[in-house]
C-alpha cells in the first residue's frame, strides 16, 4: 500500500494524470467553436454543399465538421476556399493575413459567400491554388537540376504571401489570358469540372507562361504582403508585360482559353 506523500504514489498519480490531461486537451481542441461552425448552416453553405454533390469525386464541407473521415475524394478546405476566393477577387492582403476574419466578419463573409458564388467557380479558383502548390513542389524536387531562373521562381514562391499574391495577379491577367472582355469574374468556370487533376494541369500551363515574370510581383512582398496598393500595382505590371507579348503566347494560351466557359 502506498502512503500519502510517498514517491511511489506521486509517480502513479502523475502517470494517470498525464494521459488524462492529454485527453482533456484534445477534447477542448475538438470542441473549440470556430467561426466556420457558426456559418455551417448558413443558406449559402447549404446551397454550395448541395451543388458539390454533382461532383462525387470532390468534397466541400461548408464549414460543417464531421467525425467521418473523407476518403478517395479531393477535400476542399473551407478556410482555404475563402482565402483563395478573396485573393482572386481583389484582396490578397486580407486573404493572407486574416483568413479567420473572412468567416468571422459579416461584411467579409457576405462579400465572398453570396448568391453569385457557385461550386464551379470555387473549383475554378481552388484548382489555381493547387496548381501553385504543385508548381512549387516540382521546383523543389528538381534540386540541383534547377536552372538559375527556376531557383529565382522557387525563391519567390517561398516568400510569405506569394501564393495569394500570385492568385490575385492571375485574376488581374484573366482578360489577357483569355483574349476577351470579362464582364463578371464570378462567372469564370471551366466547361468540364469532373477531373480536378486535369484542371490543375490547365493552370500549370498558365503558370509556365507567367512565372518567368515573377520579378514584377516582387515589390509587393519585399517586406511581407501588407499593402493593397502595392499588390494592385504589381499585378497591373504583370498584366502589362503579358499583354505586350500576347501574340507570342497566343497558341500556348489557346488550350486554356478553350477550356473556360466564355458565356459571361
Predicted features and spans:
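C-terminal catalytic or substrate-handling cores of phosphate/nucleotide-
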Residues: 16-180
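An N-terminal structural lobe/cap that precedes and organizes the functional/catalytic core
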Residues: 8-10
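C-terminal accessory/interaction regions of large nucleic acid-associated machines
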Residues: 165-264
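A sequence-level detector for short glycine-anchored, His/Arg-bearing signature motifs
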Residues: 1-2
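Residues at the C-termini of beta-strands that transition into short coil/loop
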Residues: 13
Amino acid at each position: 500500500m502506498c502512503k500519502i506523500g510517498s514517491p511511489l504514489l506521486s509517480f502513479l498519480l502523475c502517470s494517470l494524470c498525464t494521459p488524462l490531461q492529454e485527453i482533456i486537451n484534445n477534447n477542448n481542441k475538438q470542441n473549440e467553436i470556430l467561426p466556420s461552425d457558426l456559418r455551417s448552416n448558413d443558406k449559402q453553405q447549404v446551397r454550395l454543399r448541395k451543388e458539390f454533390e454533382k461532383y462525387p469525386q470532390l468534397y466541400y464541407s461548408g464549414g460543417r465538421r464531421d467525425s467521418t473521415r473523407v476518403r478517395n475524394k479531393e477535400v476542399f478546405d473551407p478556410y482555404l476556399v475563402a482565402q483563395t476566393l478573396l485573393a482572386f477577387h481583389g484582396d490578397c492582403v486580407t486573404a493572407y493575413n486574416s483568413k479567420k476574419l473572412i468567416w468571422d466578419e459579416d461584411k467579409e463573409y457576405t462579400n465572398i459567400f453570396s448568391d453569385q458564388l457557385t461550386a464551379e467557380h470555387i473549383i475554378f479558383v481552388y484548382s489555381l491554388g493547387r496548381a501553385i502548390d504543385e508548381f512549387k513542389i516540382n521546383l523543389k524536387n528538381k534540386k540541383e537540376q534547377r536552372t538559375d531562373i527556376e531557383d529565382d521562381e522557387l525563391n519567390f514562391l517561398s516568400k510569405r504571401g506569394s501564393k495569394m499574391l500570385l492568385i490575385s495577379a492571375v485574376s488581374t491577367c484573366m482578360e489577357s489570358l483569355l483574349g476577351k472582355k470579362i464582364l463578371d469574374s464570378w462567372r469564370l468556370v471551366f466547361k468540364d469540372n469532373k477531373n480536378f487533376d486535369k484542371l490543375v494541369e490547365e493552370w500549370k500551363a498558365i503558370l509556365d507562361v507567367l512565372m518567368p515574370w515573377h520579378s514584377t510581383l516582387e515589390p509587393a512582398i519585399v517586406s511581407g504582403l501588407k499593402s493593397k496598393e502595392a499588390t494592385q500595382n504589381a499585378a497591373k505590371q504583370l498584366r502589362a508585360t503579358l499583354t505586350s507579348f500576347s501574340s507570342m503566347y497566343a497558341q500556348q494560351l489557346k488550350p486554356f482559353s478553350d477550356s473556360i466557359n466564355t458565356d459571361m
